[in-house]
């Protein structure tokens, strides 16, 4: 697999309502944002940059040899922040930028490479992302789990918090929010869970802030729908398994800390 040249950008904000100062949370003796950057460094990325509006995050990165750039604090979305960074770095329009979330300290470097490669193989798309089949019916009906449906070429048709596609026959008589999920079967075709990892062409990132917010984006609270509303194509890489868990809450943080310690113990001295 020959991976194209690409840059990883990791947005990081301190203003988390569920887990304050999340990027600076300790995981194995280092801030979480540093652990994420280390995973990105282990990919084939030519450059890894943390994008933050918080000097404390930039200082933590500098202390561990991680490149960081300060951005404006008023960006309405993470993609808008990436747009500013693409301009700051002077990236060419055809350069590939992979957006790795700042709360994914266990992300597989190989997945980062695969998403960058997927975009390189889809010249008709401005964006690439990833998805995996769901095996838990509770996640299918969970609005916090974003689903995606694709066309025959693997391009996204729609992203939604609703259970899509709706299995008319398998779910006949099932209410939109069933009370007894254990009794609801999985549909015959896979329900794909969206993985929040994106590869962009830098030219698209420059255009993104000029695109008007879309009604579907606002209804679902999914910013990728803005790109689709304005006619951009998104290539979806289908993986066989779910990625490692991210960190949204204090409970997530404890789980990731335990998984980190376990992985270090398995590697040995």
UniProtKB/Swiss-Prot annotation:
GO terms for biological process: CMP-keto-3-deoxy-D-manno-octulosonic acid biosynthetic process; lipopolysaccharide biosynthetic process. GO terms for molecular function: 3-deoxy-manno-octulosonate cytidylyltransferase activity. GO terms for cellular component: cytosol. Keywords: Cytoplasm, Lipopolysaccharide biosynthesis, Nucleotidyltransferase, Transferase. It is an enzyme of class 2 (transferase). It is found in: Cytoplasm. It comes from Cupriavidus necator (strain ATCC 17699 / DSM 428 / KCTC 22496 / NCIMB 10442 / H16 / Stanier 337) (Ralstonia eutropha). The gene is kdsB. Pathway: Nucleotide-sugar biosynthesis; CMP-3-deoxy-D-manno-octulosonate biosynthesis; CMP-3-deoxy-D-manno-octulosonate from 3-deoxy-D-manno-octulosonate and CTP: step 1/1; Bacterial outer membrane biogenesis; lipopolysaccharide biosynthesis. This is 3-deoxy-manno-octulosonate cytidylyltransferase. Belongs to the KdsB family. Activates KDO (a required 8-carbon sugar) for incorporation into bacterial lipopolysaccharide in Gram-negative bacteria. Pfam families: CTP_transf_3 (PF02348). It catalyses: 3-deoxy-alpha-D-manno-oct-2-ulosonate + CTP = CMP-3-deoxy-beta-D-manno-octulosonate + diphosphate.
């Amino acid at each position: 697999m020959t991976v194209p040249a690409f840059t990883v950008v990791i947005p990081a904000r301190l203003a988390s309502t569920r887990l304050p100062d999340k990027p600076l949370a300790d995981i194995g003796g280092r801030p979480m944002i540093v652990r994420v950057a280390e995973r990105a460094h282990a990919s084939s990325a030519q450059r890894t940059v943390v994008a933050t509006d918080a000097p404390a995050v930039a200082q933590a990165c500098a202390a561990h040899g991680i490149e960081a750039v300060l951005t404006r604090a008023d960006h309405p979305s993470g993609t808008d922040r990436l747009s500013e960074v693409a301009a700051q770095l002077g990236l060419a329009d055809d350069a590939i930028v992979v957006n790795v979330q700042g709360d994914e300290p266990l992300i597989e470097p190989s997945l980062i490479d695969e998403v960058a490669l997927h975009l390189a193989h889809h010249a008709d798309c401005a964006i690439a992302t990833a998805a995996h089949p769901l095996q838990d019916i509770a996640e299918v009906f969970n609005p916090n789990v974003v689903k995606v449906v694709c066309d025959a070429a693997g391009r996204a048709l729609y992203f939604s918090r609703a259970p899509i596609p709706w299995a008319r026959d398998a779910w006949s008589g099932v209410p939109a929010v069933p009370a007894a999920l254990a009794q609801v079967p999985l549909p015959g075709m896979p329900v794909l869970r969206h993985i929040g990892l994106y590869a962009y062409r830098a030219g698209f990132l420059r255009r993104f802030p000029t695109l008007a917010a879309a009604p579907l984006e606002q209804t679902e609270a999914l910013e990728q729908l803005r790109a689709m509303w304005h006619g951009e194509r998104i290539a979806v890489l289908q993986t066989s398994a779910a990625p490692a868990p991210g960190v949204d809450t204090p409970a997530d943080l404890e789980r990731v800390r335990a998984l980190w310690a376990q992985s270090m113990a398995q590697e040995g001295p």
